């Protein structure tokens, strides 16, 4: 892991298209501004972990589970 020290307003550049700027420091919190391509997803780690967990649960559904859901909803997708 690369560890950098930055002051208020200073920037870290990653590759050609990502810039991370220190925009505010208050107590033990730092606010970062991130410029990146629109197609790049940026998450706080706790949100990323939650999304990954939900994706794993969704991927673990079997075909039988999906068929039951479709049957419960009916052919038109309504209860």
From Swiss-Prot:
Keywords annotated in UniProt: Bacterial flagellum biogenesis, Cytoplasm, Repressor, RNA-binding, Translation regulation
Species, as recorded: Geobacter sulfurreducens (strain ATCC 51573 / DSM 12127 / PCA)
GO MF annotation: an example: mRNA 5'-UTR binding
BP terms from Gene Ontology: bacterial-type flagellum organization; mRNA catabolic process; negative regulation of translational initiation; regulation of bacterial-type flagellum assembly; regulation of carbohydrate metabolic process
Top-level lineage group: Bacteria
Listed Pfam families: CsrA (PF02599)
The protein, known as: Translational regulator CsrA
Claim: Signal is one of the keywords in the record: no
Compartments (UniProt record): Cytoplasm
Family of this protein: Belongs to the CsrA/RsmA family.
Taxonomic lineage from the root: Bacteria, Pseudomonadati, Thermodesulfobacteriota, Desulfuromonadia, Geobacterales
Subunit (UniProt): Homodimer; the beta-strands of each monomer intercalate to form a hydrophobic core, while the alpha-helices form wings that extend away from the core.
